[in-house]
């Protein structure tokens, strides 16, 4: 296994927290630490009239978040490589700190081409 990839949908979150760039920077940093990952860089951007996007570059891969405070919604992506990291822990931090009332988490194992070849019989072609 190369790593784990978590896609997290957060619903009915605290709108003020979703729109607070400094709060999100702190929360993403905490999430990376809780996952056992090494934070290399963190960039965030606030949008007008609302919303924040953040991207944490990890030694093990990345964490990204996009927020829509007006809808109480955040889209989160956590991808970590290696066996020592726990991306689900990062997701739990973000869920709790953003006070999500509901969430949906999808977790995928990322595999090398050799490992995928053992499990995929017919490759799926993307359009275009």
Curated annotation (Swiss-Prot):
Reaction(s) catalysed by this chain's protein: S-adenosyl-L-methionine + H(+) = S-adenosyl 3-(methylsulfanyl)propylamine + CO2
Site feature: Cleavage (non-hydrolytic): 60-61
Active site residues of this protein: 61 (schiff-base intermediate with substrate), 66 (proton acceptor), 81 (proton donor)
Lineage: Bacteria, Bacillati, Cyanobacteriota, Cyanophyceae, Synechococcales
Alphabetical list of SUPFAM superfamilies matching this protein: S-adenosylmethionine decarboxylase (SSF56276)
Quaternary state and interactors: Heterotetramer of two alpha and two beta chains arranged as a dimer of alpha/beta heterodimers.
Organism (species): Parasynechococcus marenigrum (strain WH8102)
Assigned EC number: 4.1.1.50
Record's protein name: S-adenosylmethionine decarboxylase proenzyme
């Amino acid at each position: 296994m190369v790593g784990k990839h978590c896609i997290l949908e957060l619903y009915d979150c605290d709108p003020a927290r979703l729109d607070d760039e400094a709060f999100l920077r702190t929360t993403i940093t905490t999430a990376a630490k809780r996952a056992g990952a090494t934070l290399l860089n963190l960039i965030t951007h606030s949008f007008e009239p609302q919303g924040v996007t953040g991207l944490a570059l990890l030694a093990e891969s990345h964490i990204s978040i996009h927020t829509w405070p007006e809808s109480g919604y955040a889209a989160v992506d956590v991808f970590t490589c290696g066996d020592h990291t726990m991306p689900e822990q990062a997701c739990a931090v973000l869920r709790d700190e953003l006070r999500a009332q509901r969430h949906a988490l999808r977790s995928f194992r990322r595999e090398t081409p050799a490992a995928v070849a053992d499990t995929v019989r017919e490759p799926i072609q993307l359009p275009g």
